[in-house]
Design a protein with these regions (language model features):
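Hydrophobic positions within repeat-based interaction scaffolds
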Residues: 86, 123-126, 130-222
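Residue register of alpha-helical TPR repeats
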Residues: 26, 66-67, 107, 145
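Amphipathic alpha-helical segments of tetratricopeptide repeats
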Residues: 10-16, 49-57, 90-97, 130-135, ...
Length: 222
């Protein structure tokens, strides 16, 4: 619900001067992600570049800097600007390899494959696909990103069988995740309804008791 997210992000921005450094980073990242999921990649890029500028004043936030750079690379690739993504991506991979971050690296390798494809270096793209299969425990969103890349890559290679297989796997996982989100949303609405119903019942109960008490006072007064 991007209308709602904009309302709350705008409200959060009013508290900017009261935010701690990490809260400011989280705000900027959430704002950029909001644009990203709307596919508003230009505003998304501007927001992540703003985040990068903000982080330069906080060199102690090294992890956050490379997360930000990973986001910037992602947007450059969405905008088909491989030349801008190139140097940032390899610095990111080197950092997260050093940190042995198995949660982030699979996604960065997918970015590396995408970069090779956009540069028309299909030999390197194929080598990367073979070298970096997704490990067990990969985040579902990162699996989706890899499946999306693979179905586009094999479509470009005219390997229709593999393209169809990866497209089918992508659609099945995406539908499953969407169903999970719908269930979570439904559960959230149910909880809100039950909470509001409980509050309403409490108000009705209190109102009833107040009426009974008023009647008692009236009889006593008579």
């Amino acid at each position: 619900d991007f209308k709602q997210s904009k309302i709350w992000l705008d409200k959060s921005l009013e508290l900017w001067e009261l935010m701690m450094t990490h809260e400011k980073f989280n705000y900027l990242t959430n704002r950029g992600n909001d644009y990203y999921y709307q596919k508003d990649y230009l505003n998304c890029l501007n927001t992540f570049l703003q985040t990068d500028t903000f982080l330069r004043a906080h060199p102690e936030l090294e992890w956050e800097k490379y997360i930000c750079h990973s986001n910037i690379v992602d947007v450059y690739l969405k905008l088909n600007q491989p030349q801008n993504a190139d140097s940032l991506l390899f610095d990111n991979i080197a950092f997260f390899q050093k940190m042995q971050s198995e949660t982030v690296l699979p996604y960065l390798y997918t970015q590396q494959m995408e970069l090779a494809m956009q540069k028309k270096d299909y030999k390197q793209a194929e080598q990367l696909i073979q070298k970096h299969p997704l490990p067990e425990g990969t985040k579902p969103d990162h699996i989706l990103a890899r499946l999306d890349f693979l179905q586009r890559y094999y479509t470009e290679q005219a390997d229709w069988k593999k393209a169809f297989q990866y497209q089918k796997a992508y659609n099945e996982l995406n539908d499953s995740l969407r169903d999970d989100r719908v269930r979570m949303r439904t559960a959230d609405l149910q909880m809100r309804y039950e909470r509001d119903a409980t509050i309403l019942n409490q108000k009705l109960y209190i109102g009833e008791k107040e009426t009974q008490l008023l009647q008692t006072y009236t009889w006593l007064a008579i």
